[in-house]
Structures are given as C-alpha cells and as structure tokens.
C-alpha cells in the first residue's frame, strides 16, 4: 500500500481460481487459511482509502509525473556530459527515469547523494539490492560498467519542479566530484 501513499506493511494478494497456495504461517485460519494471525484492520482500511484516492487521482497524477519526468530527463541529458537515459524515451512508467553516467561508480554516487538527502537507487527496480549488474539493464544492451553506473530516480504525485532543480544541481556537483578522481574520465577529457 505504501507505493500508493497508503500504510506500510499491508498489501493485496489476488489468487486466481484454481491456484493453491501453501501457507507460510499457520494458525487460526485467517485470510482464508493462507496466513494465520490477527488481521491488521486499520491498515486494511487505510489501504482501501489509499486505493480509492489513487484511482480518483490517477489521470492527474500521471500527467503531473510525466511532465516532471520529461523535465528531469531533459535537464540531466543536457547538463551532464557522458550520460544516457536507459530504456525508451516514450514507453516508460510516468514517474521513473533511469540514467547511466560514464566514469562514475553507482554505489559511490548513491552514498554521496544519500548524504545530501537525495533518495535514489542503482540498477533496475528488479535488482536494486544485488551486487551483480542489473540483468534488466544488461538485457537492454548496457555493458556491466554502465549498468553499475546507473541511477534510478522516481517521482510521485507530490514531487515539485523546485525539488527536481535541486536534485539536478546536486547530481551535477556530485558527478563532477566523482569524475575528478576517476582516471578513466581524466584520461578521456585530456585527449
């Protein structure tokens, strides 16, 4: 539910007719015998309210996220050299932008951004906790090096243009710092 601004720790599992699941937690038969334990009624109700709000605001949220995502992509691609957008420019989630920055290690970039209050992730959403390069990014043709140098930024319905301006400013400064100690970058620009 937290993905749609609802409470954390509650979700929904749709089970198609004919599919049998084995419970991980046995107990009193709650949740149709799929998971034992007391159901969190306030969280369930909160999820329901969040779903209703998300549905009612879906079109306006999408328009808002698409406009800001396109603004972010345009600024990053035009202001940070040796950068690329990963994936399609058009066919992508409204609030998602994934970039790769040559001559930058993704984990160092993440730590430095985090220290400045910027929440981001490296790789794809499917593999953000893995030390291996994202199989999604390598499947779309990125080298292991570029997959490791990727940064995923996501936007939401409350994101503002002013926040994105700050993110781009901090991102540029941080990448400049990291590249200033990168032998491959220094060799490339000295040619």
Regions found by a protein language model. Give the residues of each.
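Conserved C-terminal alpha-helix-loop-beta "cap" of PLP-dependent enzymes
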Residues: 97-152
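Active-site PLP attachment segment
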Residues: 1-49
